[in-house]
């Protein structure tokens, strides 16, 4: 060891307290900046202690990156995204229009203007939600006076025809037991359930029979009994009936149905050719055990009355 270096060891106490050498200070400009910023931050404590919630927006310290989530998170929870108006706006409005009582009341007003006068029939038409018995794609037309397809080449009858047939069957009476031929989607049976104590309805097309059960289930109608079978045969086990309503047109009224009509009972049915050009709404009254009286009323158009089941 040279004499010059020997003089430097051991180091004195004052040599340990001296400023670091240039090689120790050069650790990067960022650290020098941070070191100089520390005393400045200590001089301004208000900028650090001011809470975000009081100001409503995050404030960044000078010389720092404002976008870093660790120091200034964006208050996303305070600004929830608005719901997209595309799907929800149209559906609820349409559903409200269909289920509102005002829409059904307007339909009832049209029925009254067309000559339906029995208040019980009008109340029954107002009580049953027709849109629940048609396909969703046709729901906007549910309260128009129009027959609508329900599949299997069958239709749901016009509201005016349903009201007219039920009013003819009632004739101001209180009905005890009613037979419907051709359940279809179940709409007319639902209306009949409001004016009769017991409603029996027969459907020969199995898918429609199942569909009617599904349509009626939400309404919780306790006095409807659905049957899968041949409507032309009727339902002898439940006869006699105060009224029989046939929702399909035949060339004549089956004798089996006439026999199941009670004395004083009324049967309402479309009668005529399958083309529909000569179909007439017909009223048959049983005036004696072997005597029936027939009246021909309005021109109508119905699907054909067929035998058997499918």
Swiss-Prot record:
Region described as Disordered: spans on this chain: 1-46, 60-79
Record field: catalytic activity: [protein]-L-isoaspartate + S-adenosyl-L-methionine = [protein]-L-isoaspartate alpha-methyl ester + S-adenosyl-L-homocysteine
GO annotation (BP), single: protein modification process
Ranges of compositional bias, category Basic and acidic residues: 14-34
GO terms of molecular function: protein-L-isoaspartate (D-aspartate) O-methyltransferase activity
Annotated catalytic residues: 157
Compartment(s): Cytoplasm
Superkingdom to which the source organism belongs: Bacteria
Keyword Lyase listed: no
Entries under Pfam families matching the protein: PCMT
Its EC number(s): 2.1.1.77
InterPro entries xref list: PCMT, SAM-dependent_MTases_sf
Feature: compositional bias, Low complexity: 35-46
UniProt KW Transferase keyword: yes
GO cellular component: cytoplasm
Keywords of this entry: Cytoplasm, Methyltransferase, S-adenosyl-L-methionine, Transferase
Main localization category: cytoplasm
HAMAP family reported for this sequence: PIMT
Family membership: Belongs to the methyltransferase superfamily. L-isoaspartyl/D-aspartyl protein methyltransferase family.
Function: Catalyzes the methyl esterification of L-isoaspartyl residues in peptides and proteins that result from spontaneous decomposition of normal L-aspartyl and L-asparaginyl residues. It plays a role in the repair and/or degradation of damaged proteins.
The protein's name in its UniProt record: Protein-L-isoaspartate O-methyltransferase
Species this protein is from: Burkholderia ambifaria (strain ATCC BAA-244 / DSM 16087 / CCUG 44356 / LMG 19182 / AMMD)
Upper taxonomic lineage: Bacteria, Pseudomonadati, Pseudomonadota, Betaproteobacteria, Burkholderiales
């Amino acid at each position: 060891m040279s004499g010059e270096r020997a003089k430097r060891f051991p180091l004195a106490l004052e040599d340990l307290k001296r400023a670091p050498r240039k090689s120790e200070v050069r650790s990067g400009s960022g650290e020098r900046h941070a070191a100089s910023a520390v005393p400045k931050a200590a001089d301004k404590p208000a900028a650090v202690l001011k809470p975000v919630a009081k100001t409503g927006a995050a404030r960044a310290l000078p010389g720092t990156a404002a976008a870093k989530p660790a120091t200034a998170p964006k208050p996303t929870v305070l600004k929830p995204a608005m719901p997209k108006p595309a799907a929800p706006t149209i559906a609820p409005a349409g559903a409200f229009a269909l289920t509102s009582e005002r829409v059904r009341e307007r339909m009832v007003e049209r029925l009254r203007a067309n000559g339906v006068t029995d208040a019980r029939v009008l109340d029954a038409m107002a009580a049953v939600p027709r849109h629940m018995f048609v396909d969703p794609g046709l729901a906007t037309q549910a309260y128009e006076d129009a027959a609508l397809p329900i599949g299997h080449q069958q239709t749901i009858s016009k509201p005016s025809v349903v009201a007219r047939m039920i009013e003819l069957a009632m004739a101001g009476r209180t009905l005890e037991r009613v037979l419907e031929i051709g359940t279809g989607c179940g709409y007319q049976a639902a209306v009949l359930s409001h004016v009769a104590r017991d409603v029996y309805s027969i459907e020969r097309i199995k898918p429609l029979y199942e569909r009617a059960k599904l349509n009626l289930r939400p309404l919780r109608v306790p006095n409807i009994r659905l049957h899968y079978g041949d409507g032309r045969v009727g339902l002898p086990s439940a006869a006699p009936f105060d009224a029989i309503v046939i929702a399909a047109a035949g060339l004549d009224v089956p004798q089996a149905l006439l026999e199941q009509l009670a004395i004083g009972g009324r049967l309402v049915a479309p009668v005529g050719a399958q083309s529909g050009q000569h179909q007439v709404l017909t009223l048959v009254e049983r005036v004696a055990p072997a005597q029936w009286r027939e009246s021909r009323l309005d021109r109508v158009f119905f699907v054909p009355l067929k035998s058997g089941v499918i």
